[in-house]
């Protein structure tokens, strides 16, 4: 247990931040799963509509410090790469 006033305050702050971070990461996870599911079902037009929401959630988390900027860039790049692979596969077949 915390002994000082400042330590008690830090516990409160860290708990508040943990909840905020979990909400942000949960949004990213939700939209990412939705996007990947649409790609698997070959609903590319719908996936294109969901992608900006995923990218927005990732960018907000990176801006607020929940995600490192390189991690955010890697996640966005991966999603774009998957979409482009599906698009090129559909065009070639």
Swiss-Prot record:
InterPro entries tied to this protein: Ribosomal_bS20, Ribosomal_bS20_sf
Cellular-component GO terms for this entry: cytosol; small ribosomal subunit
HAMAP family in alphabetical order: Ribosomal_bS20 (MF_00500)
GO BP annotations listed: translation
Purpose of the protein: Binds directly to 16S ribosomal RNA.
The UniProt record lists the keyword Membrane: no
The organism's place on the tree of life at top rank: Bacteria
PANTHER family: 30S RIBOSOMAL PROTEIN S20, SMALL RIBOSOMAL SUBUNIT PROTEIN BS20C
Keywords in alphabetical order: Ribonucleoprotein, Ribosomal protein, RNA-binding, rRNA-binding
GO molecular function: small ribosomal subunit rRNA binding; structural constituent of ribosome
Matching Pfam families: Ribosomal_S20p (PF01649)
Gene3D superfamilies with a match to the protein in the record: Ribosomal protein S20
UniProt cross-references to SUPFAM superfamilies, sorted A to Z: Ribosomal protein S20
Gene behind this protein: rpsT
Record-given protein name: Small ribosomal subunit protein bS20
Family per record: Belongs to the bacterial ribosomal protein bS20 family.
